[in-house]
A protein has these predicted regions:
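Active-site-proximal beta-alpha loop/turn segments in soluble metabolic enzymes
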Residues: 7-9, 33-42, 64-80, 101-117
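Catalytic cores of alpha/beta
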Residues: 10-22, 75-85, 146-158
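Catalytic beta/alpha-barrel core
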Residues: 29-36, 116-120, 138-144, 164-167
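Flexible, acidic glycine-rich loops studded with aromatic residues
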Residues: 138-146, 150-255
Length: 255
């Protein structure tokens, strides 16, 4: 069980991220340390990565870590990734080094509305995979949503180990719910999504939430599934349809 994006400023409020990180380390198998949302320089980011590794091991000596960040937070071409890894590992003892299992690498993924607008960088992919092998880490790319299946297969063929896909599956679930809502329920769901504000980071400045209703809902519907107001309008009996849709997409990717 992996917790993505632990660290400073990763929640709804700006904070140092320590309290939630230490709780996560007690209950997850792997926790992603990502200080880059707050600390943009390699120097600051590696220092806080080391700091969080040591704090995590104090509360759970068996915890494992994922390090690095995604392109949407900070662009990390191979030369910067190499510098980050070198400085991080030079600051750790052997036990601390062994706690790192995953490395986030980048090859051109970026989400905007319901699309992946990233430009594939094969050189970045190959060189970053080499770095992951050099340090004995499992590589992972974030924001793999909405990519063409053949491109995902191509990345795997080059040596990509794992890829994060989440909003794409959430959108599948959202569409199934939307198609089964009454008109009144759609209005309530849209209002819930609008008020959440979770759509704002995924759209351009000229996006009009009043006219692009379905786009807004598709972008952030999955963020409000745990809201009590959603529970009041949630359609029943759709679990099998949702599971089938998600399973078919996963099977397509893994072929």
């Amino acid at each position: 069980l992996v917790r993505d994006h632990g660290g400073p400023n990763q929640g709804y409020i700006r904070d140092d991220g320590v309290e939630s990180f230490l709780i996560d380390c007690q209950y997850f198998d792997v926790v992603h340390i990502d200080p880059f949302k707050r600390f943009k320089s390699i120097k600051d980011a590696f220092r806080h990565t080391v700091k969080f590794i040591r704090m995590g091991l104090q509360v759970n000596p068996n915890i494992k870590f994922e390090i690095g960040t995604e392109e949407a937070i900070k662009s990390m071409p191979p030369e910067k990734l190499s510098s980050f890894l070198n400085q991080t590992y030079n600051s750790l003892n052997e036990t601390e080094k062994d706690s790192i299992k995953y490395l986030v690498i980048q090859s051109g993924t970026a989400l905007r509305e319901n699309m992946n607008i990233g430009l594939y960088k094969e050189v970045w992919l190959n060189e970053s995979i080499y770095l992951s092998r050099k340090y004995g880490l499992i590589n992972k790319e974030h924001n793999g949503d909405y990519l063409k299946t053949d491109l995902i297969h191509k990345k795997f063929d080059h040596g990509l180990d794992t890829i994060n896909i989440a909003p794409e599956f959430g959108q599948m679930q959202t569409r199934i719910y939307w198609n089964n809502f009454t008109s009144k329920e759609r209005s309530k769901f849209y209002k819930l999504c609008l008020d959440s504000g979770r759509w704002k980071k995924w759209v351009d400045e000229d996006f009009d939430p009043d006219t692009e209703v379905e786009t807004l809902v598709n972008i952030c519907g999955h963020y409000v599934f745990s809201h009590l107001k959603f529970e009041m309008i949630k359609p029943e009996g759709l679990e099998q349809e949702i599971n089938t849709a998600v399973s078919e997409r996963i099977s397509e990717i893994l072929r």
